Every structure is written in structure tokens, then in C-alpha cells.
């Protein structure tokens, strides 16, 4: 782990990291988030009886779109040409929650961690948005990077 912030320059100002001289490598990141809800809300999603339609399909598309828009949301992120974005949603009735996982890939000069985290986060937010009429006290939690590959810092896995 580095003890320097790469997005802070010598003057202490935020800046976008210059990746011009970095090598193009295969890069991949996986992230997850959870959204906890009442059993009845989760059952409504799982049974497909939600009045707004297929909650998981909508959240999946929202997560994919969010990964592609990460540089518009996070000021110092580079715009990336993603080659793969995958968002999976898993109902976990035993915990009364949904687990969201994301995978982002590309061949490029900078990593895709923020894209993976954004995909998982926005998918969770979309579930909240679609279900808030039924339940307002849902909890989004444990958003984290699970794994990253490629680049100078190498492989990281939780």
C-alpha cells in the first residue's frame, strides 16, 4: 500500500493524474454492495410483483450505465473505454438483502476500480429508488472493492 495520494500535487492541490507514459495493460476490477430490506420488500422483488416492473433488470442496466459514466461523476477519474461491464444481483432471503457484484475490464493505462464501485453503488441506489414507495428504511452498506488486477500496483484481493 502506498502512503502517498496520487491525486494531490506538490502544492497540495487536487489534479488529474498524468497517465501518458504508463503502459497499456489488461485491467480488471470487481466490487460489491448490499441493500438490506424487509422480507416483504425482497419477496416482492423476487416474485416480480413490484408495480414498477423488473427491479433487478433495471438495477443491472443502471449499474452498467453508471460504470460508463464514472468520469462524469467522479471529478478526477479518466474517461475510459470499457470493454466489459457486468452487474449481477443475488437475492439473499436468509439475510433479507440483495448482494450486488460488478466486474469492469479494459486494456488501458489506468485502473477500473472506480467504475466497478460506481456500478455496484448505482445498482443499489436504483433498487432503493424503485422500492422506496414500499419501504423507505432500506440500508445500502458494505460497498467495497473485492479485487483488482493489472497495472503497476499489481493484484489486490480482499
Swiss-Prot record:
Enzyme class, spelled out: lyase
Catalytic activity field: (8S)-3',8-cyclo-7,8-dihydroguanosine 5'-triphosphate = cyclic pyranopterin phosphate + diphosphate
Active site per UniProt: 129
Keywords linked to the UniProt accession: Lyase, Molybdenum cofactor biosynthesis
Record-linked Pfam families: MoaC
Molecular function (Gene Ontology), one example: cyclic pyranopterin monophosphate synthase activity
EC number of the protein: 4.6.1.17
Coiled-coil region list: none
Disulfide feature: none
KW Magnesium (keyword) present: no
Residues the entry annotates as binding substrate: 76-78, 114-115
Pathway: Cofactor biosynthesis; molybdopterin biosynthesis
A Gene Ontology biological process term: Mo-molybdopterin cofactor biosynthetic process
Stated role: Catalyzes the conversion of (8S)-3',8-cyclo-7,8-dihydroguanosine 5'-triphosphate to cyclic pyranopterin monophosphate (cPMP).
Family to which this protein belongs: Belongs to the MoaC family.
The protein's assembly and partners: Homohexamer; trimer of dimers.
HAMAP family: MoaC_B
Protein's recorded name: Cyclic pyranopterin monophosphate synthase
Species: Shewanella woodyi (strain ATCC 51908 / MS32)
Lineage: Bacteria, Pseudomonadati, Pseudomonadota, Gammaproteobacteria, Alteromonadales
Amino acid at each position: 500500500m502506498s502512503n502517498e495520494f496520487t491525486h494531490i500535487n506538490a502544492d497540495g492541490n487536487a489534479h488529474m493524474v498524468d497517465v501518458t507514459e504508463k503502459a497499456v495493460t489488461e485491467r480488471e476490477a470487481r466490487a460489491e454492495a448490499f441493500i438490506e430490506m424487509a422480507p416483504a420488500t425482497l419477496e416482492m422483488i423476487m416474485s416480480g410483483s413490484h408495480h414498477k416492473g423488473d427491479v433487478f433488470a433495471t438495477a443491472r442496466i443502471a449499474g452498467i450505465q453508471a460504470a460508463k459514466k464514472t468520469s462524469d461523476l467522479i471529478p478526477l477519474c479518466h474517461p475510459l473505454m470499457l470493454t466489459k461491464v457486468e452487474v449481477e444481483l443475488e437475492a439473499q432471503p436468509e439475510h433479507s438483502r440483495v448482494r450486488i457484484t460488478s466486474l469492469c475490464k479494459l486494456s488501458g493505462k489506468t485502473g477500473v476500480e472506480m467504475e466497478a464501485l460506481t456500478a455496484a453503488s448505482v445498482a443499489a441506489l436504483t433498487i432503493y429508488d424503485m422500492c422506496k414507495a414500499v419501504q423507505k428504511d432500506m440500508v445500502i452498506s458494505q460497498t467495497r472493492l473485492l479485487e483488482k488486477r493489472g497495472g503497476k500496483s499489481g493484484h489486490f484481493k480482499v
